[in-house]
């Protein structure tokens, strides 16, 4: 009887210790700028992501213009810092850079997000604006992967986007069922489009523009926070882009103010920034860490 009681007591002690460790790990993750978050039921990733579309279109971006492999080097540095979400688009022409940066890394250690351009004019050549199931093989080859975590309809700018682009819904849903993608969503560049996306049942995740300085975003802070809140209430992943206004918030004070504000905004999962130097990554992560500490008080 004593031996049984000892075993039971010891087992209870181990369970309590395990629970304490788990709580400590969760608390540490909650305060880490690169802690893991659940973007969708299928995708767990870092709360900070690396964007590759600064001043991008027709498969050119600042990552191309920098040259000399600087973008690849920056992404490798970001990965080493714990950033594991990498955001791309067909119209950015950055698939190959991300594939090069992540070569040799375990596939389950990072998240790939890309976008399909559907609007007439700009973006990519007209003949290449195809349904997702006709693009997936090229995307997989360019990214050197067997699956893509998240594919989005890119740059929604009008409230009629459902009627215009629902031809992409079924192909993407089939790709998800086949395991070639894990989730599908939209990238919103107009508030009217975002308001619809926040409620639409097809949308697993949405990109929303938000910063404290109202740069490169549609509407004010409160209007966009309300959209993010609606999206979260409807079970959607929320990715905040333009946190630094695509470089237009160009003072240390402004960047810190906006980063902390977005970090403390509760209705989001991931924040993405188009980092162009290692010191930009360091500064952003420091500001996110400060925002998390302030929120935890």
Language-model features: where?
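Active-site mouth loops of central-metabolism enzymes
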Residues: 54-68, 119-130, 250-251
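Conserved, mostly hydrophobic/aromatic
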Residues: 50, 86, 112, 148, ...
């Amino acid at each position: 009887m004593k031996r049984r009681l000892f075993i039971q007591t010891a087992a209870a002690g181990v369970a309590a210790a395990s629970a304490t460790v788990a709580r400590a790990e969760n608390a540490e993750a909650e305060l880490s700028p690169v802690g893991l978050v659940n973007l969708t039921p299928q995708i767990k990733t870092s709360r900070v992501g690396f964007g590759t579309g600064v001043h991008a279109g027709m498969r050119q971006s600042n990552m191309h213009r920098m040259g000399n492999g600087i973008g690849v080097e920056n992404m490798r540095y970001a990965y080493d810092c714990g950033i594991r979400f990498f955001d791309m688009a067909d119209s950015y022409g950055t698939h190959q850079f991300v594939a090069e940066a992540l070569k040799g890394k375990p596939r389950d250690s990072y998240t790939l997000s890309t976008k399909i351009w559907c609007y007439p004019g700009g973006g990519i050549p007209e003949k290449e604006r195809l349904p997702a199931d006709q693009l997936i093989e090229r995307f997989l080859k360019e990214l050197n992967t067997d699956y893509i975590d998240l594919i989005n309809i890119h740059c929604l700018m009008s409230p009629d986007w459902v009627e215009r682009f629902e031809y992409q819904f079924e192909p993407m849903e089939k790709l998800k069922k086949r395991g070639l993608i894990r989730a599908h969503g939209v990238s919103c560049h107009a508030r009217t489009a975002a308001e619809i996306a926040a409620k639409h049942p097809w949308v697993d995740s949405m990109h929303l523009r938000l910063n404290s300085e109202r740069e490169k975003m549609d509407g004010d802070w409160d209007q966009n926070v309300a959209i993010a809140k609606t999206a979260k209430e409807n079970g959607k992943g929320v990715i905040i882009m333009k946190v630094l206004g695509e470089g237009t918030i160009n003072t240390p004070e402004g960047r810190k103010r906006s980063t902390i504000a977005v970090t403390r905004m509760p209705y989001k999962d991931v924040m993405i920034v188009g980092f162009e130097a290692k010191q930009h990554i360091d500064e952003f992560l420091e500001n996110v860490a400060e925002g998390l500490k302030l929120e935890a008080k």
